[in-house]
Amino acid sequence: GKLDTRVKGIPVVLYNASGFKATDVVTIEVEASRFPKSVAVYNEQGKLVVSQLVSYTDGKVRLLVEATVPANGYAVYDVRLSGEGKEMSAVEAASVENSFYKLTLNENGDITSLFDKRINKELVKAGKAIRLALFTENKSFEWPAWEILKETVDATPISITEDVKVTLCENGALRKTLCVEKRHDDSFFRQYIHLYEGVLAHRIDFTNEVDWQSTNALLKAEFPLNLNNEVATYDLGVGSVQRGNNILTAYEVYAQYWADLTDANGSYGVSIMNDSKYGWDKPDNNTLRLTLLHTPKTKKNYAYQDRQDFGHHTFTYSLVGHVGALDVVQTRENAELLNQRIKAFVVGKHRGELGKSYSLAFSDNRNVLIKALKKAESSDEYVVRVYEAAGKQAQKASIVFADNLVAAVEADGTEKTIGKATFSGNRLEVSVNPNSIKTYKVRFASNKKVQTVAEPLPLVYDKKCFSWNEFKAAANFESGYSYAAELIPAEMNVHGVPFKLETREELNGMACKGNVLKLPADCTYNRLYILAAAASDKDVKGIFRVGKYVQEVIVPSYTGFIGQWGHTGHTEGYLKDAEVAYVGTHRHSGEGDQPYEFTYMFKFAIDLPEKATEVVLPDNKDIVIFAATLTDVAATSVCPASELFRTANKCNRYQTESSTERVNILKQDMVMGYSSYVNEKEKPAFMVDGDENTKWCAIAEMPHYVDFDLGGERSINGWKLLNAAGENHSYVTSSCFLQGKSDKNGEWRTLDYVSGNGKNVLNRTLNKSESVRYLRLLVTQPMQSASGKDVRIYEMEVYE
């Protein structure tokens, strides 16, 4: 709240995370009751800037603003909406132009002409087209996900020509946009071709939305250019490299943000930038191709990868034409801006000592770019990382900060001090060799920490969650696993909120069972923060009650992934919208460390109304609280007004248990056969008795199996195993089959199988519903060790 956000209209704070002053066309969404007739936007100096209304959806107006924001800084803009208008209706079109370019499409929606008006030059090679190029043979039998074969890229790709539709969907002062829709078999493509005016007039953006369902296929963006050079330049992140045309040993090559083809005579060039793709090839002197999607044809090796890249994709690539030689520094800035867009936030109106614009740090030499600016991991210093961008000679620069410095040192990449640094006032003097990186740590003169008014709220701990290296089996947070105590600090500060954890006693977690947290007498705090996680391999829901106020939260699992890519038939893409407070690099089991089995704690905020006396916790024992802190939070309003994090998922989702409780159809009297068991207390029937404290145990020769008669045809959709990690992780079933049949005398057929499992709780969903009367659990590797022969399963469930 230190910026001055007092404006006439809607205050919008713009944030530029790049290390240079950035001017960009920013997309902003603000709430409105209707689509307005007009919009006026003013910068931090009160000057009118160019803006454009785009659309109205779900009570929000989307608009474009040409904005300038200082390096590593903020600017307050004033957005004013007025009147009531109508959105533009899309119209058929085959060309679009701005002050720099005229672009023409053919009947396939491919660009057959791109004319640079500045020097009257056609950029597309005669008889060719800038297009999405589809290779319809993509064999890769040995390493399918990793290797594209030269015979594939040597083939002639086709254009995508089915159901082509081209419309002009935007036609404003800042941006004009063609929307190209087309299809190839089951794959659908929507491409927005954006031409800008003003500061981005030199750049053409291609924003793509693809629903990809093409097998044995490779998709590239193809740029056949009216340029001639055997050599192209490719970005390496820090530095660049020149490469020639495709050869047998180098035909699919990598680059980070951009690649450039400049004519051999140096008169003109084209840079291709992108926000998420890294594979390129150059088949001839005129053409650059960017790899977009790769679904190989497979055989025995990694056969499942024949559906790789299936699903929904969003990505952007951009074209910039430049007169004269390649300016590497300018191209780096252009590409950085594409990848690190200016972010927008709608805020409340208030005074602020920092004014309406603020920059934390910038470089006074355009060849020395600030790559990172962050708090130090283990001190009160700040880390600034710079690199030399031109790649020609050593450079000196001053990094100018918003505050005076009292200390500065040179550091390595791990933030360890390695030498002295020169500074004076608010300037850090740096010297960097070509294409090199330097890291520094600085301490500011006014290095005052913002103190949060806070008080820890005592908890009644009843669960052993953390275990030490010497006693890894002493705790059982979930299924025999525990947090690694040696990683957990006694105190933690999470985004300004302090927490105190119990790290000395055996009990260090509080399971939620509808219990009550009493607030201090005459409590004046207005918010309760908690650290919590779900003692489950799934995310769980819980309801907190404060008087008549009810707040539902989703508490993510303590382990697993925060997000993952989807792979059709195997995994579902997701990204959990949760505030991660703690990450542990491994967890403990009874038999030792489990590296890369990450553990988490999450921060949640519970608002407290005036005169609140208690908080009723959820009635869900899988929600475990580790610490709680009462705070007095100033009323502030900050809402994202632009996309903060781009994901290919159409929506973010938690991996929660189904809202409809699943019923296990297996009963003890359904057991009709088995391989063996140890004793009367460990018979197969105890695996389906609903008691997690009893089990089926067998130690005879393999394979182990249990057969069930369901009493009639049932439609099976999923199943679950609870293994024996509570005894020892080595007892977790590694490989097994779920088999079924309808005829008692028929052959068993496999409904699902698991190989290399390490999870104690195994939840499976079948690819399709299977109708059977008889089921068999066939265990082929009952332990983590391939030589282990003993099976121990506490519960088995099967669902319709």
Question: Could you tell me what each predicted segment is?
Answer:
Residues E181-S187, T295-K297, F362-D364, Y387, ...:
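Extracellular beta-rich ligand/substrate-recognition surface
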Residues E222-L225, S398-D403, V540-Y549, H729-K744:
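Short, surface-exposed beta-strand/strand-loop-strand elements in extracellular ectodomains
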Residues N447-T660:
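N-terminal/edge-of-domain interface segments
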